């Protein structure tokens, strides 16, 4: 007996097989450029969907935040435990111009610094730079044994308060008189933490002091000229180079345009 129409269509899916498309075929790569404070300028790449209709790719990239190790931003492999956040401020061609957005330490570095038989001092302070950025600094310090201490390096509560006040004073002094570019240049070798340890050691011996974290709380209004200045090195950049001309060169006269 021949099958009925209902039996012949049993097990057949509606619509047939869907066409599969590669999701990466609609995306394009953009290069991320770090500010001039870092030696490795072209540090990473990022993906974005191509411009379609009113959805512009460059506008979708603005505000994107990436986190990179200092080892990727410079040639100093011994400082890979420092992580810097960069935020895309402007897009020029296929280059994303970024700006400093924060700093942090890796988890294993923090866990390796915290030891028993010592006191841990933590301090935080909000400081405003000369160019209008409000930054929050988190500093961590550790005590070490004095000559009359044998088994531990604990500090008294009164000394811990004095140490914390001295650390806050040093951070405010070093940051308030600098712009953002100078602050980042101090964060790369952590000269702020070193200065805090040197001055606070007069109160109680310290084995180390580090800027543990930096947050950007407030930014000034976006200024494209300031961003371009932050990415300039005082010489020709990758976006264009000067063409050598002979002395007394005059461009040819064009008859028609």
Curated annotation (Swiss-Prot):
This is Small ribosomal subunit protein eS1. It comes from the Eukaryota. PANTHER family: 40S RIBOSOMAL PROTEIN S3A. GO terms for molecular function: structural constituent of ribosome. Keywords: Cytoplasm, Ribonucleoprotein, Ribosomal protein. One of its GO terms (biological process) is translation. Belongs to the eukaryotic ribosomal protein eS1 family. InterPro entries: Ribosomal_eS1, Ribosomal_eS1_euk. One of its GO terms (cellular component) is cytosolic small ribosomal subunit. Residues 238-250 have a biased composition (Basic and acidic residues). Its main location: cytoplasm. Residues 1-10 have a biased composition (Low complexity). Residues 1-24, 238-257 are annotated as: Disordered. Component of the small ribosomal subunit. Mature ribosomes consist of a small (40S) and a large (60S) subunit. The 40S subunit contains about 33 different proteins and 1 molecule of RNA (18S). The 60S subunit contains about 49 different proteins and 3 molecules of RNA (28S, 5.8S and 5S). Coiled coil: none annotated. It is found in: Cytoplasm.
